[in-house]
Design a protein with these regions (language model features):
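Alpha-helical scaffold within the catalytic cores of cyclic-nucleotide enzymes
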Residues: 79-83, 111-127, 157
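Catalytic-core segments of nucleotide cyclases and related cyclic-nucleotide turnover enzymes
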Residues: 113-116, 142-178
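Short helix/loop segment flanking the catalytic signature motif in cyclic-nucleotide metabolism enzymes
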Residues: 74-77, 101-119, 152
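PAS-associated C-terminal cap
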Residues: 1-11
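Short regulatory alpha-helical coupling segments
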Residues: 14-15, 28-48, 79-87, 105
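Conserved nucleotide-binding and Mg2+-coordinating catalytic segments in signaling enzymes
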Residues: 14-33, 54-68, 76
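A short pre-motif secondary-structure segment
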Residues: 91-94
Length: 178
């Protein structure tokens, strides 16, 4: 029927609006919606929530040296490797460029550091075809009582920046609020 066809088109459009075309990961829009929902949930019911953010090291040089097709290949490779190592509850999103974030519901700082470390090791253990070893810098932040999504995102982003500043290719815990 027409209604069934319309429903399918609607579902396809929704999927397109929340996923990254290149990697198939969820996009920034979906991440923002989901983060707000998860924060509302932990504020209501308690529990834990953490973010693991990563930024591919020297990505511009990959693009400059090997071309944009190779850059796209690196992004796709990273998504596949990350997806294979995530737990079922984790949500992988591409924020844009070479930046990814994993939303980890029901996860505290210690658990999130373990998730990030496993992802970091998985990425650095296998070279990308035609490019070689590509690493990433990771930041980890757990939600703190009363914290906004923007604040949590800022802290995890600052942790990635600290990892880059400390020499890249590492996992860095965020500084607690206050």
């Amino acid at each position: 029927s027409d209604i069934t066809g319309l429903k399918l088109v609607e579902e396809e459009l929704r999927a397109l609006s929340i996923t990254d075309a290149l990697t198939g990961a969820f996009n920034r829009r979906y991440f923002q919606e989901r983060l707000e929902g998860e924060i509302a949930r932990v504020q209501r019911r308690g529990g834990a929530l953490a973010l693991v953010m990563l930024d591919i090291d020297h990505f511009k040089q990959v693009n400059d040296r090997f071309g944009h097709a190779a850059g796209d290949q690196v992004l796709t490779f990273f998504c596949q490797r990350l997806s294979q190592r995530l737990r079922r509850i984790d949500v992988l999103c591409r924020l844009g460029g070479e930046e990814f974030i994993v939303l980890c519901p029901d996860t505290d700082q210690v658990q999130a550091m373990a998730v990030a470390t496993a992802l970091w090791q998985a990425l650095r253990s296998e070279p990308v075809d035609g490019v070689g070893l590509v690493t990433a810098s990771f930041g980890v932040a757990a939600w703190e009582l009363g914290e906004s999504g923007d604040s949590l995102l800022r802290r995890v982003d600052d942790a990635v920046y600290a990892a880059k500043k400390a020499g890249r290719d590492r996992v860095q815990a965020a500084v607690p609020r206050g």
